[in-house]
């Protein structure tokens, strides 16, 4: 869990873990409310507007746009991305608890590359990202930071829209944006 504290304003970001985002947010708020009752040190009040539950299972799942990955050289082609993912699905991903949950959500076991292509959004929401990430990015550990920065620069805004929209609407960032706009004028 990552927290950005800015005086008494903060934004807590949590992986979606393939679960109901609203319920995860409520659980997180209740957890911190309970901790405040038990601890001597007062923690800041965690309210729903301070919590962003990621749309995807984990942050890593935001980095699986085959077109961008091809442009970066992470995969040879978009088709190679889907072929590799399907190969790993058949090999072991379908046996993971998140893979079983994905199959349950879909109502069928994926049997082809076209199934992978058709359900990429569900894969990013319900399949554990750490496993997927290592398949494609594991060999780039030494260049990881640079590679991810380049990925973010190349990716369309909509790939990160739930994160960027939440930040855009967060009070601290809205006021900073207004300050920056004033400086530009």
What are these regions (language model features)?
Residues 1-185:
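Acidic, divalent-metal-binding catalytic cores of TOPRIM
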């Amino acid at each position: 869990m990552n927290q950005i504290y800015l005086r008494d304003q903060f934004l807590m970001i949590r992986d979606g873990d393939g679960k109901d985002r609203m319920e995860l947010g409520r659980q997180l708020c209740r957890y911190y409310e309970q901790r405040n009752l038990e601890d001597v040190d007062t923690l800041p009040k965690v309210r729903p507007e301070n919590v962003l539950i990621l749309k995807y299972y984990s942050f890593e799942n935001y980095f699986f746009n085959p077109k961008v990955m091809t442009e970066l050289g992470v995969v040879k082609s978009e088709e190679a991305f889907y072929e590799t993912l399907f190969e790993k699905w058949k090999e072991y991903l379908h046996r993971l608890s998140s893979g079983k949950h994905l199959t349950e959500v879909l109502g069928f076991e994926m049997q082809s590359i076209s199934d992978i292509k058709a359900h990429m959004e569900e894969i990013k929401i319900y399949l554990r990202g750490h496993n997927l990430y290592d398949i494609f990015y594991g060999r780039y550990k030494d260049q990881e930071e640079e590679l991810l920065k380049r990925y973010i620069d190349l990716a369309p805004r909509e790939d990160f829209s739930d994160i960027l929209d939440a930040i855009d609407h967060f009070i601290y960032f809205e006021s900073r944006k207004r300050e920056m706009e004033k400086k530009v004028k």
